[in-house]
Amino acid sequence: MERIKASVLLRGLAPDSMMFGEAEVSLVTTDSREVRPGCIFVAFPGERFDGHDFAAKALEEGALCVVVNHPVEGVPAEKSVLCPDSYHAMMVLGANYRSQFHPKVVGVTGSVGKTTTKQMCYAAIEGFGNTIKTEGNQNNELGLPRTMFRIGRDTEYAVVEMGMSHRGEIERLSRCARPDVGIITCIGVSHIGNLGSQENICKAKLEICAGLPEGAPLVLNGDDPFLRKAKLPEHVRPVWFSLGDESADVCALSIQQEADGMSFVLEDHEEGTFLVKIPAMGRHNVANALAAYCAATRLGLDARKVVRGIGNFEQTGMRQKVVHSKGIDVIEDCYNANPDSMKAALAMFKEYPCKRRFALLGDMLELGDLSREAHEEVGREAAESGLDTLITYGEQAKRTAVVAAAKGLTTLHANTYREAADALLKLMQPGDALLVKASRGMALEKVLELFYKEQP
């Protein structure tokens, strides 16, 4: 974080009567252990700890002021910036800081593929200048301001991921980040329990337009029926990408799955035709690559160099990471899951070169009333995916196993991580491949820890 006047950073939060003079701030923190002289400490109430309990100590250690939800005993009023919502306070601080710098910003949202697309955008752009990106899962109203604070005078580009659970969240994130280009990867059913329908999810994702300037490119998946039907704001310029539809602005043709990723021909009506290879499996990752390409080139960056950058992208965490373990290929995809990403992973795995295919699938969370139907649909997909055996874990995934078994697939339901690991150790042999996928909350990596440790 660059040094910035406190009066600028606190605009819209602190009343004019608070006198900060020429004081400058080089740190905004929510962690009392990080407090240093001249910083701003934002107190967050939590289940285990309440930041308000540390507000007085933060001032003792030199904080310029504290942002609190209510008056705190021992904290002078002249050092207290009152804001009933700590998340709102962070967003205002982040937006005020962002307004002082002028990098080109790509904003990425969508139901599936946000993080991979963010990584591909970063790979496409970083060769053109100093570039930052959202780290980890910092894609919400606490994490996005933290990303803004990492922008500096020498930052030329930023790739910012925007997540949501409810209407209005993407709008607030977009107004804070003020992207120059927006991406919506697709409209799925994640958080449908909160939003009610995919139409409402589409409206929520389109809130990214709130922070886009007049004439800004909005990169959209032309194969998504909800985006195709959506009414777009007049101030944005849609850029459509597609897997196979040559009428789209950018399309992928001759898509091939190879041992180490995907290859395809990219046709861009503006820039020409390119052969692209990406180190990621599945047609869905081709779509992610197209989105990243569209965003980078519509920023005015050289298309050939963008294509080379995308070819060097690196996946993060447990997202379709291929591990070669004692002759068995394990595709670790247990960071997150929803019906669309499950189907995409199974479609990819069906083409994976190996002797036998095994899948360990767990619950998909936050699906509300659609949960039973969605898990049963995954069971039908699994039965058509060329699997030798399906192992399931989790209460909802039982329905996946029941439906898959009814269609003739050999299935096994594990009630514990130990049972799942034992099944894999008993069944799998060198030359086989394993797909592991579930929502983050299912923690299927614990099965893999046992499996790797005890492989003969």
Task: Go through the PLM ranges and name each one.
Residues 413, 431-452:
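Peripheral docking tails and interdomain loops at the edges
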Residues 1-92, 352-354, 380-381, 385-395, ...:
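N-terminal leader/targeting and accessory segments in enzymes
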Residues 68, 72-77, 183-330, 354-355, ...:
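Acidic, Mg2+-coordinating active-site environments of NTP-dependent enzymes
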Residues 64-65, 104, 156, 180, ...:
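Short acidic/polar active-site loop segments enriched in Thr and Asp
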Residues 10-11, 89-217, 222, 226-235, ...:
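Phosphate-binding loop of NTP-binding sites
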Residues 46-49, 316, 334-407, 456:
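Active-site beta-alpha connecting loops in nucleotide-dependent enzymes
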Residues 9, 39, 58, 93, ...:
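Residue-level signal for inorganic ion chemistry
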